[in-house]
A protein has these predicted regions:
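Extracellular glycoside hydrolase catalytic/binding regions
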Residues: 253, 274-413
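Active-site mouth of glycoside hydrolases
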Residues: 120-333
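Aromatic- and carboxylate-lined catalytic core of secreted/periplasmic carbohydrate-active enzymes
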Residues: 29-32, 50-51, 137, 356-359, ...
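Exposed aromatic-hydrophobic patches
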Residues: 81-85, 476-478, 511-525
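Bacterial N-terminal signal peptides that target proteins for export
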Residues: 2-12
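Non-catalytic, glycine-rich low-complexity segments
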Residues: 28-65, 70-73, 109-115, 436-441
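Extended acidic/polar, glycine-enriched regions
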Residues: 68-128
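Bacterial N-terminal signal peptides
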Residues: 11-22
């Protein structure tokens, strides 16, 4: 399910180097932290008045010619913290600044050792449409959504973590603020602000216990290798607490506080909102401002997106790193899924394509498992990414989408199967020819995934599209196929989770202007049922055409 086994010898060396570096740092009395881990500086300071608004605290961390500025925060009881995620090994010097004399002018050094096993750093945008960890390791996004799991009873939260640990998912979408859904059965134990529920809040004073609990869960996801796509606002308050309609100053203060607390966690992604357009008290100018606050205050440049309801945000804006889309129809076939890539030239993540659930569930939660898996495959061969959740109500009234707990659907094992296929393939898949052969993605001349979807073919005549053509008046990217290349074909049953190699190899011969066939005209026999795919990999013969650009 992961590519880790291919790197085990290196992991052992990294672990040894990390342990040695930490030991040397301890011997010198200098604090040590691994690259991309979290260094925390704790300082005592003033507790009188309202430190959340009265005290400003920051620090600069310097490594050679580089300087990184980070904001600190008040954690209650006269305690202040500054958190830092170093992205380079070596000695980093720091110096604090504050309007409180007790916090200003603190200096020191932290030794940054090589990253620990499995730590590849934060996820970044890579090659325009895709993602990779900071060290270059490919990241094949496979996410699920569980909005309010951190606001449910402790036992249910622990069950959710166990479920995630055994799941194929490497990203979790979750909310900061509680939802109104199911609140009578499972009332939130903590709230983000000082005050008394339901609506007697002091928006100038945060509740540190709430945020410590949030951080604990974010850290546990990190330790499981799961990215946390943190939803900062949502419209599901249902008029209970008013967190969806705070005044502008409270919104801005909240964003700066949560970024100061959480930006040093390498697995954080910022989702500005879920169904942003359903929050009637906010304008597009508000969302633009929120993005800019997060972008400015996060020194590490974590991924930033915003999820839509009925209306799309302008994802072309520079502070949006990738598109987070709700659109189930877009992934009913690969040709539709690809279109958003051409609009924004950014990664496209269909975080909500409807959910697997019971037939009597609301229309957004009534997909069958085969249909949800089908949408994942359509999005995959289109060079995009797709998200999961489920809406089965159990006897206690808990659903994975809202509360977490256990997964009951049939899609997760099939998504684990898809993840294994992706991680055994090239780092990224792109459409081969999105104008004509929309059901095929891959790397031209090397690797292809052909997905038949609902069709039930009895055979497939070997045929690979040339790809996009050089053409007057401008040269477009074109494919890398030539005569004499040798390919192996595997038949994939995406539902039965089987891979069946086809005997022999297929040798390419150009057939017309736009495609290559097998030189002997061979075809692949298929079992005439839906949900089939083909994996086509180059195994020898002629080399791909040199100098060809893209797919």
């Amino acid at each position: 399910m992961s590519s880790k086994p291919r790197r085990l010898p290196w992991l052992a060396l990294i672990a040894a180097a990390t342990a040695l570096g930490a030991a040397l740092a301890r011997a010198s009395g200098t604090p040590a932290v691994a690259q991309w881990d979290l260094f925390e500086l704790t300082l005592p300071g003033p507790a009188a008045g309202n430190p959340f608004v009265d005290v400003q605290l920051s620090a600069t961390f310097t490594h050679g010619a580089r300087t990184v500025a980070v904001n600190g925060f008040y954690d209650g009881d006269g305690t202040y913290r500054i958190r830092f995620m170093p992205d380079e090994t070596g000695a980093w010097r720091y110096a604090t600044a504050s309007n409180a004399p007790a916090l200003a002018g603190r200096t020191g050094t932290v030794d940054v050792t090589p990253p620990g096993p499995g730590d590849h750093g934060p996820v970044r945008v890579h090659d325009t449409y895709h993602f990779a960890y900071a060290d270059g390791t490919p990241y094949h996004e496979l996410g699920t959504t569980c909005y309010s799991w951190i606001h449910r009873p402790e036992a249910l939260q622990e069950e959710t973590l166990r479920t995630l640990a055994a799941s194929p998912f490497n990203k979790l979408r979750m909310c900061v603020f509680p939802q109104g859904h199911n609140v009578r059965l499972m009332p939130p134990p903590l709230f983000p602000f000082a005050g008394t529920p339901p609506q007697d809040w002091d928006f100038t004073r945060f509740n540190p216990a709430f945020f410590r609990h949030l951080e604990q869960r974010v850290g546990q996801l990190r330790d499981l290798g799961i990215e946390c796509d943190l939803i900062l606002f949502h419209p599901y308050d249902d008029g209970l607490w008013g967190f969806d309609r705070m005044p502008a100053a409270a919104d801005d203060r909240y964003l700066r506080y949560i970024v100061a607390r959480l930006a040093a966690y390498r697995n954080i992604w910022w989702s500005l909102a879920n169904e942003f357009d359903f929050m009637r008290a906010k304008t597009d100018a508000d969302w633009d401002r929120f993005f800019q606050i997060v972008q400015h205050d996060d020194p590490y440049g974590h991924l930033r997106s915003i999820h839509n309801g009925a209306r799309l945000y302008n994802n072309s804006l520079p502070w949006v790193t990738h598109a987070s889309i709700q659109n189930g129809a877009a992934v009913e076939d690969p040709g539709r899924a690809e279109l958003y890539r051409d609009v924004w030239h950014k990664p496209v993540v269909y975080d909500e394509v409807k959910y697997e659930g019971s037939p009597d569930a609301p229309r957004w939660g009534d997909l069958t498992a085969p249909e949800l898996v089908h949408r994942f495959w359509c999005g995959t061969v289109a060079g995009t990414y797709v998200g999961h959740s489920e809406f089965f109500t159990d006897q206690a009234g808990a659903v994975w989408l809202g509360e977490g707990g256990t997964l009951r659907g049939e899609s997760p094992p099939r998504l684990a199967f898809l993840r294994r296929i992706l991680e055994a393939g090239p780092p990224e898949l792109d459409p081969i020819d999105q104008w004509q052969d929309t059901d095929m993605g891959g790397v031209s001349g090397e690797y292809y995934l052909l997905y038949f979807g609902r069709e039930a073919p009895a055979s497939w005549t070997f045929r690979l599209p040339v790809g996009r053509q050089p053409w007057w008046p401008r040269t477009l990217p074109y494919g890398r196929l030539v005569d004499g290349m040798e390919f192996q074909v595997d038949v994939i049953d995406t539902w039965a989770m089987t891979i069946t190699p086809v005997p022999g190899v297929f040798i390419t011969k150009q057939k017309g202007r736009y495609a290559f066939a097998d030189r002997d005209g061979r075809a692949v026999a298929l079992p005439a049922r839906p949900w089939l795919a083909l994996r086509i990999r180059r195994v020898g013969g002629a080399e791909p055409a040199p100098g060809a650009g893209g797919n």
